[in-house]
Swiss-Prot record:
Gene3D superfamilies: 3.30.420.40. InterPro entries: ATPase_NBD, Gcp-like_dom, KAE1/TsaD, Peptidase_M22_CS, TsaD. It comes from Shewanella piezotolerans (strain WP3 / JCM 13877). Required for the formation of a threonylcarbamoyl group on adenosine at position 37 (t(6)A37) in tRNAs that read codons beginning with adenine. Is involved in the transfer of the threonylcarbamoyl moiety of threonylcarbamoyl-AMP (TC-AMP) to the N6 group of A37, together with TsaE and TsaB. TsaD likely plays a direct catalytic role in this reaction. The lineage of its organism: Bacteria, Pseudomonadati, Pseudomonadota, Gammaproteobacteria, Alteromonadales. CDD domains: ASKHA_NBD_TsaD_bac. GO terms for cellular component: cytoplasm. This is tRNA N6-adenosine threonylcarbamoyltransferase. GO terms for biological process: tRNA threonylcarbamoyladenosine modification. It catalyses: L-threonylcarbamoyladenylate + adenosine(37) in tRNA = N(6)-L-threonylcarbamoyladenosine(37) in tRNA + AMP + H(+).
Length: 338
């Protein structure tokens, strides 16, 4: 089965073709980073309009790269939510139109399920069950995964997501958008333990996260300290250490609670070098193993949507002809794939 995947949940237009037997045949991606840089963040209306401009040329490119036409495609998967409603509707409209015009089955995919399953695009794939740490600009959650669609949200952020905290702290430091990766680059020049930031909610039972207070602590530290490059690097390093330590502590707690031996990390923040290294060391010490997608599949992309959609289309799941987007969509409400 060959599936065309369409991702338009935020500020990346991602298109891919995935074959059940041959794997990923093609994927194309257009990032709107330059478009939104002057505004310091994503402007929803501009994002939607740019998806409209880019989506059809990217679909043509992905099909050409796979040496296919739409007639060679067996199904279509598009991101249904969560995300920006205008951006979601662009992908949903195009996906549904192609499905209707060419009489193909189509399915709306949960964006975070796409991230959760992104490591399945690699050669070394995790077996079920496993613990998933999903960390991005909009989400931070720990999920117990027994199978596709069999998810239990064990913990999540009660305020800012980890990626959001990275971006907001970077903005406080005067770093250009997108701030998260720039903050991490600056942190690499910092001296470890120069500052001691709190590890939020790690002294309390439970698996939820809270990063808004950490952002406030960073703001106060930035305001109180000199503005030279080394001090800024030290503050960035301390902030990153605090976020990574917090995520690692919660992961270890969740692994103990569930008894799982495999950990998946996915989402934009999963590309963070310090996070990957610390969780890999932790899993080695625990006798387990960590899995994550390659860097290009940590951020939003069409490949993960094509893969996730294929699993559901193979199981006979499809959506009706309605064009729908779900800006909010709890992950644990998804239908299992038997």
């Amino acid at each position: 089965m060959r599936v065309l995947g369409i991702e338009t949940s935020c500020d990346e237009t991602g298109i891919a073709v995935y074959d059940d037997d041959k794997g990923l045949l093609s994927h194309t991606l257009y990032s709107q980073v330059k478009l939104h840089a002057d505004y310091g963040g994503v402007v929803p209306e501009l994002a939607s309009r740019d998806h409209v401009r880019k989506i059809v040329p990217l679909i043509r490119q992905a099909l050409a790269d796979a040496d296919m036409t739409i007639e060679d495609i067996d199904g279509i998967a598009y991101t249904k939510g969560p995300g920006l409603i205008g951006a979601l509707l662009v992908g949903a409209c195009v996906g549904r139109a192609l499905a209707f015009s060419w009489d193909k089955p189509a399915i709306g995919v949960h964006h975070m399920e796409g991230h959760l399953l992104a490591p399945m695009l690699e050669d070394d794939v995790p077996e079920f069950p496993f613990l998933a740490l999903l960390v991005s600009g909009g989400h931070s959650m720990l999920v117990g995964v027994e199978g596709i669609g069999r998810y239990e949200v064990l913990g999540e952020s009660v305020d800012d997501a980890a990626g959001e905290a990275f971006d907001k702290t970077a903005k406080l430091m005067g770093l250009d958008y997108p701030g998260g990766p720039r903050l991490s680059k600056l942190a690499a020049k910092g001296v470890a333990n120069s500052y001691r930031f709190p590890r939020p909610m790690t002294d309390k039972p439970g698996l939820n996260f809270s990063f808004s207070g950490l952002k406030t602590f960073a703001a106060n530290t930035i305001a109180a300290e000199p503005n030279d490059e080394q001090t800024r690097a030290n503050i960035a390093c301390a902030f990153e250490e605090a976020v990574v330590d917090t995520l690692a502590i919660k992961c270890k707690r969740a692994l103990k609670q569930t008894g799982y031996q495999r950990l998946v990390i996915a989402g934009g923040v999963s590309a963070n070098t310090r996070l990957r290294a610390q969780l890999a060391e932790m899993m080695t010490n625990l006798g387990g193993k960590v899995f994550y997608p390659r860097g290009e599949f940590c951020t939003d992309n069409g490949a993960m949507i094509a893969y996730a959609g294929l699993q559901r289309l193979k199981a006979g799941q499809t959506d009706d002809l309605g064009v729908k987007g779900q800006p909010r969509w709890p992950l644990d409400t998804l239908e299992p794939v038997d």
